[in-house]
Every structure is written in structure tokens, then in C-alpha cells.
């Protein structure tokens, strides 16, 4: 498959994940206008307060509608544009007063195709046991690990991982245990032929033991078993080498634009 096709699958999956998990947040709002989507919450994490171009033929008015909605809520937010595909909207954001962020300005969107069975086999260290979450105790463990691993406030995990997701088709939540203690989290989100890999976080005391790679491989393997032949994710620069060893390659780069006048979360 051409990288442009993989980029489309990555983008569709990310939006499906974002708009899906924020249903766990009571004050979340997902609005669509003119081919753009605004995902807005009270959570202090910009993934869940952002505007994205969703459709071909998106309009400047649609993007600005999302920006206006975000400004009305008053929380910090970002707009992420795909380099190349969304370049036409840079001028729109500039006129609206948004600026490219200096810190963490880009996010690589990555895809693995075809999924290499050798790359994802035999990845779990012997002391790690990965379990699919089926109850509230598992949700609590997932939230605990995600909060510790990402260094975020507890409400972020609480607002994006909840019991209702356990009944959602295509969504699987995971926790990995070592010595009976939760040490690594993960979440898989399926859209068509793509399995999205999300919420890979390892607690500090369990890092550099291959647990994050093992969780990623498990999500990919379960996706293959469900009929997927493409895996997608959004990487940090720190995590990119780990994902590349599992067969992922960058297919799109997102550039982040922020609103200088938006207030900061307290």
C-alpha cells in the first residue's frame, strides 16, 4: 500500500479513537463543521483538546468553527495539521492568531504494513503477563499505570478509559503485570483493516525491560486475529525507535498550532 493510503488509515483511526474515548469524560464535546472535527474536554492534555481536519474538501470556515468552539470553552487547545495534506490551512490559522508551537511542534503518525509476524512474535518477557481488561478492577489498574507512566494528572486516564469502553466493538483495554503488580498499559482501537495502538505507558520502575514493546506487539497480534493487516499509532520522538523495530514507519507528520491567549489549566 502506498504511504498516502496508510496515512489516511492512520488519520481515520486516530480520530475514531479520540472521539470514542472522550465519551468517558462527562463534559466532552465532539463537534463537526466543514470537514473538520473539534474534540474538546476539560482534561489537561492536548490530545483531548484539539481540532483536526477530518475530510477531503474541508473548508477554512470549518476549521475556524472548531477554533471558535474551543475558545468559548476557555481551556488550552491545539490545532494539528498534517504536513502536506493540510498546508492550505496554515494561513487560516495564522490569521486567526494561532502560532506553531515551539515545544514538541510535531507528532509523527506511523503505520506498519504489512504487519510482520516475526517482528511481533516472542516479544513478551517471561515475567510479564498481559491481560485483557474485563472489569472495573482492570480499568482502575489501567488508569493507575497510564497516569504513572505518562506523568499526567489522574483525571486524564479517568476521562479516557472507563467501563463503557469494555462493551464498545473494536476497543480492547489491556494491563500488563509483573510479579502480580500492574506495570504497563495499552489500548487497541480497530477501524476497518487498521488496528490503532494507544495508551502504551510503563511505570518508571519497570522501564527498559521490553514491556512497552511487548504490549504494542500484543495489541498488533490481537488486531491481526481480528482481521487487521495495518497497525497505526502516533509516536513521541522518544518512542519512535521502539516502534520502528516493530515495523512502523512514519507516514505523516502533524504540526501543532496553539492559541497564545488560551488560559492554562490550573
Name each model-derived stretch.
Residues 102, 182-184, 252:
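A structural microfeature
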Residues 25, 110-123, 178, 189, ...:
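Terminal substrate-recognition subdomain of acyl/acetyltransferases
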Residues 60-67, 198-204, 208-221, 225, ...:
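Conserved acetyl-CoA-binding loop-helix of GNAT-fold acetyltransferases
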Residues 56-137, 151, 257-259:
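Acyl-donor-binding surface of acyltransferase catalytic domains
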Residues 86-100, 213, 237-253:
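Conserved active-site alpha-helix within GNAT-family acetyltransferase domains
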Residues 1-73, 85:
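N-terminal charged segments
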Residues 73-83, 223-235:
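Conserved GNAT acetyl-CoA-binding A-motif
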Residues 154-205:
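A conserved beta-strand-loop-helix scaffold within acyl/acetyltransferase catalytic domains
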